């Protein structure tokens, strides 16, 4: 009888990536098949996020539901992973003794052994350590699920912003070697992936080892990824302004595979608040980056993160944030009311902004960015946009859907053979969360470039010793 696995995922794209790797890993080692129905599962895994307020209580509420399933089926294995697991550790079992496995973001690769241990003697397992690169070494080969894919290139963060738990729950920055990343992407491209999204908590801080022992830069990596045959679009998230160096901006100037859309969190437009947040950059420095980016790529659109109601934020501070929003003309944002995360320096600050004031500021900020986003969308009306067709539209099974370079969802009439390919679509209608259009050109009519293969890149950049022996070892 087929064994079933149910994974519930909360949080960022990194968590989504981790959950997909858990599923692949347990399929490869134990033959577990994913199910959307928790009641059918032999193993239940909760992949948690600790960014938002009351994250812990949300976890225990979900576990309370699963407890009822465990009472009906004592052999059911329940595991809790992700950032709340890393933060809370044994405390989870103190409140929910029926949980069998507690694992952190860096130990998910040990899940097969943890499950075997629980199956063997029913003893609970807790492993929230930080074994650095070992996680990536032990994950199964990637499996494509459509024309787009996420690829994790690094973990952790060294920035220690005062409001953020990531350095404490995912550890400090660890970069994957460039060869490992390129090999994974080449495998995905061979399975039909056309667009990759490079992931990291601070992705542009990537400093991975190259095949010759040197340390690569993020700009170097972007160019190598762009050279992989079949990869026509590259995205990355999430970036930090302090690591957004001029060599990355140059990649926007000369690498068309890098999309004209960037998510670059700023959090506030007030230098005083940025300093309290530990962001290590000013609003002016942020705007300087955007100015350089738009000089290199005039059509680039920018999204950002904002926290409103940070301890000490005055009306003047908020007005500076609104001015920054207008100056940069952000296309979209992820914006939140400040919520103190336990164990962070900001949790010890006096939360002196009234709750109603926080809500009002958030409403004003989101309304302004929604207006700017709609203005950007209206500019696209009547233009022809290149769309990567991802599948059937959520709005109608008779239509297809895909995304523009600037991350707009576009719905249009098409044929199933277009899925996984590019089409040019004339934009005919604009809606708050999507666009509509009609196909004017298929991929066969585009004459797309023939990409350079990884082998040719390596041959061109090959380094040899005095005997003519190359340093590269495939």
From Swiss-Prot:
Record note on cofactor: Binds 2 [4Fe-4S] clusters. One cluster is coordinated with 3 cysteines and an exchangeable S-adenosyl-L-methionine.
UniProt xrefs under Pfam families: Radical_SAM, TRAM, UPF0004
Binding residues annotated for [4Fe-4S] cluster 2, in chain numbering: 157, 161, 164
Annotated MTTase N-terminal domain residues: 3-120
SUPFAM superfamilies: Radical SAM enzymes
Alphabetic keyword roster: 4Fe-4S, Cytoplasm, Iron, Iron-sulfur, Metal-binding, S-adenosyl-L-methionine, Transferase, tRNA processing
Enzyme Commission number: 2.8.4.3
Subcellular localization: Cytoplasm
Major location (coarse): cytoplasm
Radical SAM core domain segment(s): 143-375
Domain TRAM: 378-441
General function of this protein: Catalyzes the methylthiolation of N6-(dimethylallyl)adenosine (i(6)A), leading to the formation of 2-methylthio-N6-(dimethylallyl)adenosine (ms(2)i(6)A) at position 37 in tRNAs that read codons beginning with uridine.
Family of the protein in this entry: Belongs to the methylthiotransferase family. MiaB subfamily.
Protein name: tRNA-2-methylthio-N(6)-dimethylallyladenosine synthase
Biological source species: Escherichia coli (strain K12)
């Amino acid at each position: 009888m087929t064994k079933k696995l149910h994974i519930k995922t909360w949080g960022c794209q990194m968590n989504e990536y981790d959950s997909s790797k858990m599923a692949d890993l347990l399929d490869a080692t134990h033959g577990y098949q994913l199910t959307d129905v928790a009641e059918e599962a032999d193993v239940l895994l909760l992949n948690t996020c600790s960014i938002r307020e009351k994250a812990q209580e949300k976890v225990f509420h979900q576990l309370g539901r699963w407890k009822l399933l465990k009472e009906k089926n004592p052999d059911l294995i329940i595991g809790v992973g992700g950032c709340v697991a890393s933060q809370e550790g044994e405390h989870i079992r103190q409140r929910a003794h029926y949980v069998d496995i507690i694992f952190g973001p860096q130990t998910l690769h040990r899940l097969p052994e943890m499950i075997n241990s629980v199956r063997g003697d029913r003893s609970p397992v807790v492993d929230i350590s930080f074994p650095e690169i070992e996680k990536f070494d032990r994950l199964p080969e990637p499996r494509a699920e459509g024309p787009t894919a996420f690829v994790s290139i690094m973990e952790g963060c060294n920035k220690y912003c005062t409001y953020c738990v990531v350095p404490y729950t995912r550890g400090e920055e660890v970069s994957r070697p460039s060869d490992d990343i390129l090999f994974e992407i080449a495998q995905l491209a061979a399975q039909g992936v056309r667009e990759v999204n490079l992931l990291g908590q601070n992705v542009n801080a990537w400093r991975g080892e190259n095949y010759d022992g040197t340390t690569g830069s993020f700009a170097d990596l972007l160019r190598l990824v762009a050279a992989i045959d079949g990869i026509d679009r590259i995205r990355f998230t999430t970036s930090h302004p302090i690591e957004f160096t001029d060599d990355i901006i140059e990649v926007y100037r000369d690498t068309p595979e890098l999309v004209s859309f960037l998510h670059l969190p700023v959090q506030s437009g007030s230098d005083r608040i940025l300093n309290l947040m530990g962001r290590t950059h000013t609003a002016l420095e942020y705007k300087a980056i955007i100015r350089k980016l738009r000089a290199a790529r005039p059509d680039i659109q920018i999204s950002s993160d904002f926290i409103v109601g940070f301890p000490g934020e005055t009306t003047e501070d908020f007005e500076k944030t609104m001015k920054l929003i207008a100056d940069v003309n952000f296309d979209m944002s992820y914006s939140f009311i400040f919520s103190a995360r336990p164990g962070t320096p900001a949790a010890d600050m006096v939360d002196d902004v009234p709750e109603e004031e926080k809500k009002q500021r958030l409403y004003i900020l989101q309304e302004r960015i929604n207006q700017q986003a709609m203005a950007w969308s209206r500019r696209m009306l009547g233009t022809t946009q290149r769309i990567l067709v991802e599948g059937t539209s959520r709005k109608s099974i008779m239509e297809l859907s895909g995304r523009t370079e600037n991350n707009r969802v576009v719905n249009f009439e098409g044929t199933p053979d277009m899925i996984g390919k590019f089409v040019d679509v004339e934009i005919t209608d604009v809606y708050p969360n999507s666009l509509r259009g009609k196909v004017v050109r298929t991929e066969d009519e585009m004459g797309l470039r023939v990409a350079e293969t990884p082998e040719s890149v390596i041959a061109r950049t090959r380094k040899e010793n005095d005997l003519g022996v190359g340093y590269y070892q495939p």
